[in-house]
């Protein structure tokens, strides 16, 4: 237990002496006060939703329609655009009002959650078990804990189905692969084949396989949400109506801190997946809104110079580069025709502006000579100058690259931030899992505070 250093610091039964935790231990003081812990969680949800609403309106207020979203440091409007709000052909923003509505709805929701959080933190009952037994719980009540797990799963499943309904019945979603450079379309034939959907999970995460990050069409994305939403709803019902089996009761640690550690591990995994998805995937994260991926920017540069030099009379099929390999085109390890030069490392890149120029044997020479469309040239030139090179605390671009635009790509920011957050959540998982296991084993004594510097410091008040 924590050592008391200021006996006057008492707050409604949540003082250090009665709980074993000091004020800075936060919600640990509320482990046995279900009503107050509810208040803390509802208030936390209110803060999250407030940020979403406020940041949403901030982005709307600063949005410049003439510039691409990814050049303006936006991270919320690209998501709203991806699910089909306010955009038209080619990802052009045609109406910002839906974005404004989204921000206002989130702000209103945050006010409701904020009121509920303050109410339960200050006014509501300290514990729920007596007044509202349905919402009350004991951490060691295994049946109640799995019931709560089930309720959470059902809510997550409904969330997945909301995207499905939006894609199928409420205006559709933005599909970067729509002919002519992307458009909003209704998904009429989502993939429901378990072989396809679960095939992604069985793929290798390495190389060109890419696990679930390799998804490259909206039908599979929406079909995946049908599967995950349905499984979560049925899994939730299962956990509500059943009791944990004997092996599960023995295998898990059943305490508040253990559940915290499980949750942190789950969020950590989701953070790492989001990191990879936002960095590599240009279907769930359309390049029109989030900017090109690294391989995409590289391939688009090779394509842009191929177009330029071909117009100047170069024979792009036979020109040699300084290494003796093809300057513009060469063969991949599997015999396909690919772009030559440094971008050969990204030979398995797939993008909606490039795929029309392929045939069964890679890039089609006849199409490259006769079929390149103006929108493909414009898209490639734009992506070439917007490689995702910035980091969390830097400007973008390369100092020696005269074609680079100085900006920080949302892909850089989202990938870097989610990796960092995923890592810290994983460390939090290890910390709380270790404490929970030690407490369950009976040798958790806490940290020795006898010689802690804070003991000799002046009290806060």
UniProtKB/Swiss-Prot annotation:
This protein's record includes keyword ATP-binding: no
Bound cofactor: record note: Binds multiple chlorophylls and provides some of the ligands for the Ca-4Mn-5O cluster of the oxygen-evolving complex. It may also provide a ligand for a Cl- that is required for oxygen evolution. PSII binds additional chlorophylls, carotenoids and specific lipids.
Pfam families: PSII
UniProt keyword terms in alphabetical order: Acetylation, Chlorophyll, Chloroplast, Chromophore, Manganese, Membrane, Metal-binding, Phosphoprotein, Photosynthesis, Photosystem II, Plastid, Thylakoid, Transmembrane, Transmembrane helix
GO CC terms, sorted: chloroplast thylakoid membrane; photosystem II
InterPro entries named among the record's database cross-references: PS_antenna-like (IPR000932), PS_II_antenna-like_sf (IPR036001), PSII_PsbC (IPR005869), PSII_PsbC_sf (IPR044900)
Any GO BP annotation: photosynthetic electron transport in photosystem II
Transmembrane intervals: 57-81, 122-143, 166-188, 243-263, 279-300, 435-459
Subcellular location: Plastid, Chloroplast thylakoid membrane
Molecular function as annotated in GO: chlorophyll binding; electron transporter, transferring electrons within the cyclic electron transport pathway of photosynthesis activity; metal ion binding
Propeptide residue range(s): 1-2
Primary site of residence: plastid
Record-listed N-acetylthreonine modification sites: 3
Oligomeric form and interacting partners: PSII is composed of 1 copy each of membrane proteins PsbA, PsbB, PsbC, PsbD, PsbE, PsbF, PsbH, PsbI, PsbJ, PsbK, PsbL, PsbM, PsbT, PsbX, PsbY, PsbZ, Psb30/Ycf12, at least 3 peripheral proteins of the oxygen-evolving complex and a large number of cofactors. It forms dimeric complexes.
NCBIfam families reported in the protein's UniProt record: psbC
Similarity comment: Belongs to the PsbB/PsbC family. PsbC subfamily.
Protein name: Photosystem II CP43 reaction center protein
Natural source organism: Pleurastrum terricola (Filamentous green alga)
């Amino acid at each position: 237990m924590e050592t008391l250093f200021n006996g006057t610091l008492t707050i409604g039964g949540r003082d250090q002496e009665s709980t074993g935790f000091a004020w800075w231990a936060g919600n640990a003081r509320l482990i046995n006060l279900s009503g107050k812990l509810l208040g803390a969680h509802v208030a936390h949800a209110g803060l999250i939703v407030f940020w979403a609403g406020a940041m949403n309106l901030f982005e709307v207020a600063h949005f410049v329609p003439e510039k691409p979203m990814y050049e303006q440091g936006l991270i919320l409007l690209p998501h709203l655009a991806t699910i089909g709000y306010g955009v038209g052909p080619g990802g052009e923003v045609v109406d910002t009002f839906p974005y404004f509505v989204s921000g206002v709805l989130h702000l209103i929701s945050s006010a409701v959650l904020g009121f509920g959080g303050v109410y339960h933190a200050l006014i509501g009952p300290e514990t729920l078990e007596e007044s509202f037994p349905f919402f009350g719980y004991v951490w060691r009540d295994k049946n109640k804990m799995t019931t709560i797990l089930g309720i959470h799963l059902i809510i997550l499943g409904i969330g997945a189905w909301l995207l499905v309904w939006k894609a199928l019945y409420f205006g559709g979603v933005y599909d970067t692969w729509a002919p002519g450079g992307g458009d909003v379309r209704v998904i009429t034939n989502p993939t429901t084949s378990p072989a396809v959907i679960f095939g992604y999970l069985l793929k290798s995460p390495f190389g060109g396989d890419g696990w679930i990050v390799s998804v490259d069409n909206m039908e599979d994305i929406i079909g995946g949400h049908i599967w995950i939403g349905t499984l979560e709803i049925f899994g939730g019902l299962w956990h509500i109506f059943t009791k944990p089996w004997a092996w599960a009761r023995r295998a898990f640690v059943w305490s508040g801190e253990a559940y915290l550690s499980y949750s942190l591990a789950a969020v950590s995994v989701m953070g790492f997946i989001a990191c990879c998805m936002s960095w590599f995937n240009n279907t769930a994260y359309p390049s029109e809104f989030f900017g090109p991926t690294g391989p995409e920017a590289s391939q688009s540069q090779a394509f842009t110079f191929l177009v330029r030099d071909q117009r100047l009379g170069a024979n792009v099929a036979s020109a040699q580069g300084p290494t003796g390999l093809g300057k513009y085109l060469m063969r991949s390890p599997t015999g396909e025709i690919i772009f030559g030069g440094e971008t050969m490392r990204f030979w398995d890149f797939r993008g909606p502006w490039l795929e029309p120029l392929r045939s069964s044997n890679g890039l089609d020479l006849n199409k490259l000579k006769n079929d390149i469309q103006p929108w493909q040239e414009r898209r490639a030139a734009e992506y070439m100058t917007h490689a995702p090179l910035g980091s969390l605390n830097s400007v973008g671009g390369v100092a020696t690259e005269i074609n680079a635009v100085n900006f920080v790509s949302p892909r850089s920011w989202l990938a870097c931030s989610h990796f960092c957050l995923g890592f810290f959540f994983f460390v939090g998982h290890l910390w709380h899992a270790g404490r929970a296991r030690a407490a369950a084993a009976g040798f958790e004594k806490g940290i020795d505070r006898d010689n802690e510097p804070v003991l000799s410091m002046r009290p806060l008040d």
